[in-house]
Amino acid sequence: MPDFERKQLPHGVPNWVADGAVYFVAINCRIRGEDQLTTKSKSEAIFEAFRHYESLGKWHVRLCLLMPDHLHALISFNTREYSMSSIIRSFKGYLAKEQQIDWQKNYFDHRLRNDAALEEKAQYIRLNPVRAGLVEQATEWPYLIEAEV
């Protein structure tokens, strides 16, 4: 059977998109089903990296939830100074080196166009561990950071 080649979409942000637009981002580990993200030490390192990139002015993380083999986040990128793909490439590279996380090559992003879409994706993200059968209530999942808005 031939290898399946997944179509790769460009991650460039058009110049007509306002800086500060919020994106739904999903980043997967290369090996699905293996817990690479939700150990105490790795989750702390990942959240610290999110905070560090925010302190550098590269992004503003509204919400990030770690699952065992992927993460979901709602992020506003500083696209005036950095490209979205370069920020995520750097973030993934740092965590691959420091925490030996084996990421998939690419990532998924979708720009959220209004507050209703933002809240819908936030709820989707918060309920992910419930849908996966990892907890009964979303509030029981410890691998979540959420900014005060």
Feature roles, as predicted:
Residues M1-V149:
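Short catalytic/metal-binding and nucleic-acid-binding patches
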